[in-house]
């Protein structure tokens, strides 16, 4: 498994597609409590058009989990540092939930490194201290298993959960094996981040995707984000919070159509 030392932290990443070809790059950023495997439904289609860089956000998957709290500046700095290490000058970016929040910050503050950005199931301000403070504390004191039954049912609709037990079991396994300090420290980063004042200054072409049934980053919040970003597109899928898995085909087509259209 490839690793890169970025900002003092070992980050696990994977590249799909022809790494040494001339195709543009896309960086995929995972949601809180998942890892780079969440993008499996998109990789085959995306790698026909792009060099695909997936990575485990610090504190997740096989990346290192240094003691927190973390900040949005660290999360964006990890993306930029990984791009620098791999000599990627500019890239498209797609993130879900926490990954989408990272995308908002990148687009607002580092537009020179981005071509286009897809912000999925996210908002410029996700949740509140009433959500994140007790969740981070519970992760640190009781571990990830104590959170699983409360958090995971919010990721998908009841129909999908009933229909795809094998997928859910795999996702649950990743969640419960996420480093508890890494998870909690990312909760701290989300809690401390409010990008609503910065969203109107984003000049990067943006697509915002929401899930109709998403309770964590609601469609109303998605529309608010899209309306704040000049020229942003908005698409709503019949899904809950992890729409790239629940509605994989529609998500992939929506993203590809946006990224490959001629300006």
How would you describe each model-predicted region?
Residues 74-91:
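Conserved acidic catalytic loop of the alpha/beta-hydrolase fold
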Residues 127-130, 142-201:
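Conserved alpha/beta-hydrolase catalytic His-Asp/Glu region
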Residues 212-217:
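Acidic catalytic loop of the alpha/beta-hydrolase fold
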């Amino acid at each position: 498994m490839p690793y890169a030392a970025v900002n003092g932290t070992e980050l696990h990443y994977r590249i799909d597609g022809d790494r040494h070809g001339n195709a543009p790059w896309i960086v995929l950023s995972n949601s809180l409590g998942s890892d780079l495997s969440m993008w499996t439904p998109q990789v085959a289609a995306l790698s026909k058009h792009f060099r695909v860089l997936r990575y485990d956000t610090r504190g997740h998957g096989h990346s290192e989990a240094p003691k927190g709290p973390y900040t949005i500046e660290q999360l964006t700095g990890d993306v930029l540092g990984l791009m620098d290490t791999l000599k990627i000058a500019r890239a498209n970016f797609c993130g879900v939930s926490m990954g989408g929040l990272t995308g908002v910050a990148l687009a607002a503050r580092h537009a020179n490194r981005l071509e286009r950005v897809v912000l999925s199931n996210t908002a410029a301000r996700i949740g509140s201290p009433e959500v994140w403070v007790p969740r981070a504390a519970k992760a640190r004191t009781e571990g990830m298993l104590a959170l699983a039954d409360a958090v995971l049912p919010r990721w998908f609709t009841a129909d999908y959960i009933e229909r795809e037990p094998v997928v859910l079991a795999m996702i649950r396994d990743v969640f419960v094996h996420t480093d508890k300090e890494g998870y909690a420290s990312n909760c701290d980063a989300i809690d401390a981040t409010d990008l609503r004042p910065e969203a109107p200054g984003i000049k990067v072409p943006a697509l915002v995707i929401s899930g109709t049934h998403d309770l964590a980053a609601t469609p109303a919040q998605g529309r608010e984000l899209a309306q704040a970003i000049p020229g942003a597109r908005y698409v709503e899928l019949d899904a809950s919070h992890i729409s790239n898995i629940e509605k994989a085909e529609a998500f992939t087509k929506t993203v590809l159509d946006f990224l490959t259209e001629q300006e």
